[in-house]
Amino acid sequence: MSTREIRIATRKSALALWQAEYVKARLEQAHTGLQVTLVPMVSRGDKLLDAPLAKIGGKGLFVKELETALLDNEADIAVHSMKDVPMDFPEGLGLYCICEREDPRDAFVSNTFDSLEALPAGSIVGTSSLRRQAQLLARRPDLQIRFLRGNVNTRLAKLDAGEYDAIILAAAGLIRLGFEDRITSTISVDDSLPAGGQGAVGIECRSADVEIHALLAPLHHVDTADRVIAERALNKRLNGGCQVPIACYAVLEGDQLWLRGLVGQPSGGTLLVADARAPRAAAEALGVQVAEDLLGQGAEAILKEVYGEAGHP
């Protein structure tokens, strides 16, 4: 295989750049002499910071600009947080690598209180996620959920300024950026089921670029990929973008996958849950099965209501 340069399309946020640098280091470690450069760019989701994500359009909000760079041959691969990656790809592009997953749980961050349970009634909790909001309010309907956008540093600064009593963030992002000490407590997946793909990094590239596929192979983590495939299949069957109150989380039990799924009203009034097990080779079918269970319980009506409020399909 000839030595070549790989250009990585990435968003400019600190977390996105960390993920791109991680992939760069792994590629250079796996392939001596390979030149890897970053091509930072701004996504639509990065520009629109004054509105809840659910209101500004769900699918592909953080990836479209990166995909355009791949299609225009301005970059060779794009590095994404898997929870932001739409289910379908533009013609000529595909997902060819999923890296090993970091901690997939949600993190409770507060300067005053030790845990979600310790928050007094009426406490203000910051999150931009309808998934987190639905599960939080189902457990603690006495809390106030307040909109929170911006990068990790911005969100922590808003907490430190006293705008919130606590905020909920992905543990993976805090760990990767060196803010592990800011995690007051991690929230069990039993109490806050993660978003599909949360904590995993995916790599998208051109479908025809087989040399790139081969270079990415050492970074692919099969155990993570099988879990994420099941989660994404559930999301796809529910027509879920990254900004809907859908949660799903798969774990490996030997050669079996156990997938849990959840759809909730943002008010926390109704939470639908389902789970099933299947051989890991049937990951995609498992995702569809759990999604069908949720649909049978009435998930479609909840999701239609959310999409209607957001003003997009």
From Swiss-Prot:
Protein name, UniProt field: Porphobilinogen deaminase
GO BP terms, alphabetized: protoporphyrinogen IX biosynthetic process
Gene: hemC
Gene Ontology cellular-component terms listed: cytoplasm
SUPFAM superfamilies: Periplasmic binding protein-like II, Porphobilinogen deaminase (hydroxymethylbilane synthase), C-terminal domain
Source species: Pseudomonas putida (strain ATCC 47054 / DSM 6125 / CFBP 8728 / NCIMB 11950 / KT2440)
Keyword terms of this UniProt record: Porphyrin biosynthesis, Transferase
Quaternary organization: Monomer.
Family statement: Belongs to the HMBS family.
Enzyme Commission no: 2.5.1.61
Coiled coil region boundaries: none
